[in-house]
Amino acid sequence: MLQLSSTQVTPVIAQGGVIAYPTEAVYGLGCDPDNDQAIEKLLAVKQRPWQKGLILVASSFEQLLPYVDVAQLTQAQLDFAHSKWPGPFTFVMPVKSHVSNKLRGEFDSIAVRVSAHPIVRELCDSLNKPLVSTSANLAGQDPVLTSRQILTDFADKIDALVLGDLGQQAQPSTIIDARSGLVLRNGQ
């Protein structure tokens, strides 16, 4: 497994690779959201059913516009999400119809976050698009908190580890339904 900086890993992602990278609270697994084969590989590594869907992280809301159907949201709903970003808040928003089922699962929505973590932001800026994000762990197990554990648990399963430190969050992000305002998972 390659160990790279956030600026060096772009070609790995562009070629369909799956990476591990530090986020606000835990290590994440990620790939190109427009590459179904990469998403399938990520789901296989994590042993996660496609039906559950995945999260997209971005450095700006503009990067999420190709995926989110903003026409189904009110200005107040968008303003609320923007008031929490960048930061540890994931919003479930209506998804555009062309977005792969492998990414959105069996839902008519997609979970999105504008991250405040500098490495996540660098990754998304270097790709000029969001990154698929899911916690680096096998389904049902605790998320990975150290690069050493990534190297042990995912050595021959992923293509690269992005070097860097986790953020200061103690818990994964809070998840909020953008349409209803309902908190689906408390984080922080």
UniProtKB/Swiss-Prot annotation:
Cellular component per GO, a single term: cytoplasm
Tagged with keyword Nucleotidyltransferase: yes
Reaction(s) the record says it catalyses: L-threonine + hydrogencarbonate + ATP = L-threonylcarbamoyladenylate + diphosphate + H2O
UniProt-listed Gene3D superfamilies: DHBP synthase
Keyword ATP-binding: yes
Domain YrdC-like span(s) in chain numbering: 3-188
Membership in a protein family: Belongs to the SUA5 family. TsaC subfamily.
Name the UniProt record assigns to this protein: Threonylcarbamoyl-AMP synthase
Taxonomic source organism: Shewanella denitrificans (strain OS217 / ATCC BAA-1090 / DSM 15013)
UniProt gene name: tsaC
